UniProtKB/Swiss-Prot annotation:
E.C. number(s) listed in UniProt: 3.2.1.-
Keyword match Oxidoreductase: no
Lineage: Bacteria, Pseudomonadati, Pseudomonadota, Gammaproteobacteria, Alteromonadales
Modifications the protein undergoes after translation, according to the UniProt entry: Predicted to be exported by the Tat system. The position of the signal peptide cleavage has not been experimentally proven.
Entry keyword Signal: yes
Signal peptide per UniProt: 1-31
Keyword entries, A-Z: Glycosidase, Hydrolase, NAD, Signal
Protein name from the UniProt record: Glycosyl hydrolase family 109 protein
Molecular-function GO terms, alphabetical: hydrolase activity, acting on glycosyl bonds; nucleotide binding
Length: 459
């Protein structure tokens, strides 16, 4: 009996030791991914590409989001739409038809398999590539785009692991090519106005921000074979964290000059139970349907808190499951006042229009009149006509092409894309460790300390 107990004890002790070793290996792997790696090339902060009289564009992915970009590019001057790629013939045909109807030359078409995009990348008459594919393809395609000598413009998120983030950063530095994650919300009218107000000191010294992606998308679960829900639904069965942080976080980061005088230091994260998607599947699908066989593990509501090196705080939330109105929060609080979105409202102690800071001022027109961003003043009406999330898509693409044609640095660089995207992964790490804090990698390798703040750009 004694020997049996001893054997069981030794077996348990061995299992515990193995568990500790496994945990230490995982911890060491995470620590090594956080530590700055040897620089692969020169920093691309402020990278300016040689001027392009005409920007020649290739598109990888022209389905839901990609087709929207095709539509917007047809309204831009100084661009040629050279080639498009997708695995679905129907969306390719739609994109080609639209381009031709806009009196533009018919683009080359690439399809056939998941790697057909490499044929597009092999062309020598393309300057930039717009990547609008499922998330898992973003980093690999961006890396191959830069390695082919082209600038990469990739949809959100830029990458799905810490290692992928580093690989994209390293490739940009080694090739000296732009990799911009196309965070369109940074170009919304309100976001640009608030950026202008922040730079003019309206809110005083910044203290705290709140960002979110609150967008009920359960209906996408009914997209089974094609469209976004056909692949996005499965991420709710693979991860528990903030799956989609950048729409709210991008603008708040620019307000705070993240990677340009401050940077994210550490994060802690919590998730609610994951209930809503299983309930929706039970209500909307037959019992034997695939959607009812999935195990949904991503908490319906995730809340993460970020601390910056300068001590500022940012709350970031994700909720695409519960029935509630859309919101990105878009709150920025300073020593002199606050702006909050959804609905837009302002309260300031000094420098306002006479209203007490104990009450919200929701009359935005006078604030627009005084602080509208120069970009929106220049092309806002054109953006509203051409559409794209209220015009922000058009402003983003217009600004991208303007910078490339005029030899200016882009407003968002690879370090921004990595820093905003990595919240996805770090929130998961924190949740798996009882919401203990996790450290952000410094993708700039210290260059954030001397990088110039993002200015109020004109046009």
């Amino acid at each position: 009996m004694h020997n049996i107990h001893r054997r069981n004890f030794l077996k348990a002790a061995g299992a515990a030791t193995a568990g500790l070793v496994t945990a230490n290996i995982a911890l060491n792997a995470y620590a090594s991914s956080v530590a700055p790696k040897p620089q692969a090339g020169k920093s691309v902060i402020g990278l300016i590409a040689p001027k392009m009289d005409v920007v020649r564009v290739g598109f990888i992915g022209v389905g839901e989001r990609g087709f929207s970009h095709v539509e917007q590019f047809c309204h831009l001057e100084g661009v040629e739409l050279k080639a498009i790629c997708d695995t679905h013939q129907a969306v390719l045909d739609r994109a080609v038809d639209h381009i031709v109807k806009q009196n533009r030359p018919k683009p080359a078409v690439y399809t056939g398999n998941d790697l057909s995009y490499r044929d597009l990348l092999s062309r020598d008459d393309i300057d930039i590539v717009i990547i609008s594919t499922p998330w898992e393809w973003h980093a690999p395609m961006a890396i191959e785009t830069m390695e082919s000598g082209k600038h990469a413009f990739v949809e959100v998120p830029m990458a799905l692991t810490v290692e992928e983030c580093w690989q994209v950063v390293d490739t940009a530095e080694r090739t000296q090519k732009n990799c911009m994650m196309m965070e369109n919300v940074n170009y919304g009218r309100e976001e640009l106005m608030v950026l202008n107000m922040v730079r003019q000191g309206v809110f005083g010294e910044l203290l705290h921000g709140e960002a979110a992606y609150i967008h009920e998308l359960r209906w996408q679960m009914k997209e089974i074979d094609h469209k976004t829900g056909s692949w996005r639904t499965y991420w709710h069965t693979k991860r528990n964290g903030n799956l989609y942080p950048t729409h709210g976080l991008g603008p708040v980061s620019q307000y705070m000059n993240i990677n340009r005088g401050d940077r994210f230091d550490y994060l802690t994260s919590m998730s609610s139970p994951a209930l809503g998607r299983a309930l929706y599947a039970k209500r909307e699908f037959p019992a034997d349907h695939e959607r009812n066989q999935l195990k949904y593990i991503n908490g319906d509501i995730n809340t993460s808190l970020i601390k910056t090196v300068k001590g500022r705080t940012i709350m970031v939330q994700h909720d695409t499951t519960t029935p509630r109105p859309y919101s990105r929060h878009n709150l920025i609080q300073g020593t002199n006042g606050v702006f909050a979105g959804f609905p837009n409202r302002i309260a300031v102690e000094n420098g306002g229009f006479g209203q007490s800071y104990h009450e919200w001022d929701m009359d935005m027109q006078k604030w627009y009149d005084k602080y509208d961003h120069p970009l929106w003043q220049r092309i806002g009406k054109e953006a509203e006509i051409n559409g794209g999330h209220g015009g922000m898509d058009f402003v983003m693409l217009w600004r991208m092409i303007y910078c490339l044609r005029n030899g200016e640095a882009l407003d968002q660089d690879v370090y921004d894309g990595a820093s905003w995207s990595v919240v996805n992964i770090l929130s998961e790490h924190s949740l798996n460790d009882r919401s203990n804090s996790v450290t952000f990698p410094d993708f700039t390798r210290g260059a954030w300390q001397t990088a110039k703040p993002l200015g109020i750009v004109g046009a």
